[in-house]
């Protein structure tokens, strides 16, 4: 380990000037995860990798499949999909489930179906989209599972497009959080639909069920879920002062409890932590010895701006270290990773970034290399 230079120490002294009350947090949710969008750091988790029934939160994967088909040019927002008798029977007004109130054998645009899924949680809209893209809902569900694997959602299996209870239809809070981050990052132009508070179809106006949209806390999505098996769940995201958090909770006992737990966890995440730039590529933090080079030392700096999540209190327990294999063998090319800069804090995952060389250094001449080798054997340096 190498001691960091004074410039980094000064940054830490500046950051430690923050003062607020950070405290432990608990939740009644059986499954929960709260992550920082920018860094991906987990701020809180409870059974995040335990399989659970996601109910209508599954529809986020359905939405992703549609948005990717739009991006690929396979469909357009104005394309009209057929509403089959099966879609109407299992997801329509007579089904007793969440519905967009589509008419059987009608044709509805992809754009309206998307809003029916996102805002109204319409099972009929999901099935119509699934049949239009996958030929059948089961075929579409297989596509959903395959795409989930591509995204690294190793614990997710989808048996339908709606989240209707099925013994094999499972996911985890962590997988849903990763899916949400992907949606926000790669589909910004469509993401605004998740913040729309109501949608009218067939003369019936339905309100968005996401309770955080009405809580004046910067929430702009995403999806609720509820079945008797799963309890009440929510995938939510909110942004305050340029900082975004993603929350997944499930297993609550009521709508009221879901809303209160979501507000509590999201507010805690914004109050208890801050995002800061610890170092930039302009900050040479370490001088590493060079072996058989024309210069004895090479500077090491972060490969890009090192953005970290820091608690607003308790920074005295923070440990910042730089590690690398030394000496660095010449010739050296600028920008090559040779080590890591790490930040360790109690209760949080280690945050790290590559340390890269800041200069090109040629090898020294043959005689000088021989003398360096002798010096290394005798003196170890």
Placement of each model-derived feature along the sequence:
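Positively charged n-region of N-terminal signal peptides that target proteins for export
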Residues: 1-6
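Bacterial N-terminal signal peptides
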Residues: 7-17
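Generic marker of residues within folded, mature protein domains
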Residues: 14, 22, 44, 71-73, ...
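Intrinsically disordered/low-complexity terminal segments and short unstructured peptides
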Residues: 15, 26-29, 343
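Active-site-adjacent loops and short helices of periplasmic peptidoglycan-processing enzymes
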Residues: 22-177, 181-185
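Domain-terminus/edge residues, biased toward the C-terminal soluble/receptor-binding domains
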Residues: 153-157, 165-381
């Amino acid at each position: 380990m190498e001691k960091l230079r004074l410039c980094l120490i000064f940054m830490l002294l500046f950051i430690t000037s923050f003062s607020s009350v950070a405290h432990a947090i608990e939740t009644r949710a059986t499954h929960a995860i709260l992550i920082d969008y920018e860094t991906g750091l987990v701020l809180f988790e409870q059974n995040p990798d335990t399989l659970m029934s996601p109910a209508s939160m599954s529809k986020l994967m359905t939405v992703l499949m549609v948005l990717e088909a739009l991006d690929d040019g396979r469909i357009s927002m104005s394309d009209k999909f057929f509403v089959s008798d099966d879609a109407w029977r299992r997801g329509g007004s007579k089904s007793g489930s969440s519905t967009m109130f589509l008419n059987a054998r009608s044709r509805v645009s992809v754009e309206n179906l998307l809003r029916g899924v996102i805002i109204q949680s319409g099972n009929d809209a999901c099935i119509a989209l699934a049949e239009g893209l996958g030929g059948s809902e089961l075929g579409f569900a297989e596509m959903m599972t395959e795409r989930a694997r591509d995204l690294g959602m190793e614990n997710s299996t989808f048996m339908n497009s709606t989240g209707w209870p099925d013994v094999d239809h499972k996911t985890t809070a962590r997988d849903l959080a990763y899916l949400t981050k992907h949606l926000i990052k790669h589909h910004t132009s469509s993401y605004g639909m998740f913040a729309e508070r109501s949608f009218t179809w067939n003369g019936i106006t339905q309100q968005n069920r996401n309770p955080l949209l009405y809580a004046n806390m910067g929430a702009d999505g995403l999806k609720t879920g509820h079945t008797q098996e799963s309890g009440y769940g929510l995938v939510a995201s909110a942004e305050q002062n340029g900082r975004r958090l993603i929350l997944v909770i499930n297993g609550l006992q009521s709508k009221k409890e879901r809303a209160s737990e979501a507000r509590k966890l999201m507010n805690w995440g914004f109050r208890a932590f801050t995002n800061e730039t610890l170092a930039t590529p302009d900050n040479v933090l370490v001088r590493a010895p060079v072996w058989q080079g024309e210069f004895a030392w090479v500077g090491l700096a972060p490969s890009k701006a090192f953005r970290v999540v820091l608690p607003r209190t308790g920074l005295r327990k923070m440990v910042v270290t730089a590690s690398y294999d030394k000496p660095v063998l010449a010739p050296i090319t600028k920008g090559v990773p040779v080590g890591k800069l790490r930040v360790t804090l109690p209760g949080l995952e280690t945050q790290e970034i590559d340390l890269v060389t800041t200069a090109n250094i040629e090898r020294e001449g043959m005689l000088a290399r021989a003398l360096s080798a002798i010096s290394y054997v005798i003196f170890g340096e």
